[in-house]
């Protein structure tokens, strides 16, 4: 019934969020399907997340229950093992998830050197930036103002390291977006209909 998801103009409509968590790698073993927030994955009967299939997203997962700890952004696609959804490779724990609301096609973000939106700043509009250094910005990122769109920031260039979900709003210091240090060196937009066949860190060209 794919036609249910098409308008007369042929443009895809946003789908209800849907993600399937499997206990084993490569989509094997016991599984559980989610269509809304899940504060504790173990309460669904899934002891450990071994692989993830996102049928409609995007989603954000967390290392700890109740949306705490390291963050992992999932877009529509297949994540056959834990290291396909984390590039920090610090933990294989995935304990809670929630859908990400994507309500804007336009994207604008301002990153500031110091807390409370002070110091040097870099403004990004409708673009992904794999390296702040290449754009001449070598400062730390201590506060962020997301004026439109939904973004994910990364600790290192090339979309590597810890991930930080940046939804519309103000983040007065790095702790507000979950960063242990004011270090963000790349950022990209989250768009509702993106497809990553092998997970967000192996985009097809």
From Swiss-Prot:
Residues 102-106 are annotated as: Connecting peptide. GO terms for biological process: lens development in camera-type eye; visual perception. The modification N-acetylalanine is found at residue 2. Residues 2-16 are annotated as: N-terminal arm. Crystallins are the dominant structural components of the vertebrate eye lens. Residues 17-56, 57-101, 107-148, 149-191 form the Beta/gamma crystallin 'Greek key' domain. Keywords: Acetylation, Eye lens protein, Repeat. Residues 193-205 are annotated as: C-terminal arm. SUPFAM superfamilies: gamma-Crystallin-like. GO terms for molecular function: identical protein binding; structural constituent of eye lens. Disulfide bonds: none annotated. Homo/heterodimer, or complexes of higher-order. The structure of beta-crystallin oligomers seems to be stabilized through interactions between the N-terminal arms. Belongs to the beta/gamma-crystallin family. The keyword Acetylation applies. It comes from Canis lupus familiaris. InterPro entries: Beta/Gamma-Crystallin, Beta/gamma_crystallin, G_crystallin-like. Has a two-domain beta-structure, folded into four very similar Greek key motifs. This is Beta-crystallin B2. The gene is CRYBB2.
């Amino acid at each position: 019934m794919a036609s249910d998801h098409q308008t007369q103009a042929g443009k895809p409509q946003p789908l209800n969020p849907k993600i399937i968590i499997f206990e084993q790698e490569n989509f094997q073993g016991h599984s559980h399907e989610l269509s809304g927030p899940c504060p504790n994955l173990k309460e669904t009967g899934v002891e450990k997340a071994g692989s993830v299939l996102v049928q409609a997203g995007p989603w954000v997962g967390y290392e700890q229950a109740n949306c705490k700890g390291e963050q992992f952004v999932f877009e529509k696609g297949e994540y056959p093992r834990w290291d396909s959804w984390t590039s920090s490779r610090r933990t294989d724990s995935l304990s809670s998830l929630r859908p990400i609301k994507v309500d804007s096609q336009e994207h604008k973000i301002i990153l500031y050197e110091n807390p409370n939106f002070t110091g040097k700043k870099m403004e990004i509009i409708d673009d992904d930036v794999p390296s702040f250094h290449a754009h001449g910005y070598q400062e730390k990122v201590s506060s962020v103002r997301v004026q439109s769109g939904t973004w994910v920031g990364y600790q290192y260039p090339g979309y590597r390291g810890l991930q930080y979900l940046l939804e519309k709003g103000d983040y007065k210091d790095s702790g507000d977006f979950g960063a242990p240090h004011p270090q963000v060196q790349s950022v990209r937009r989250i768009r509702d209909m993106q497809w990553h066949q092998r997970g967000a860190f192996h985009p097809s060209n």
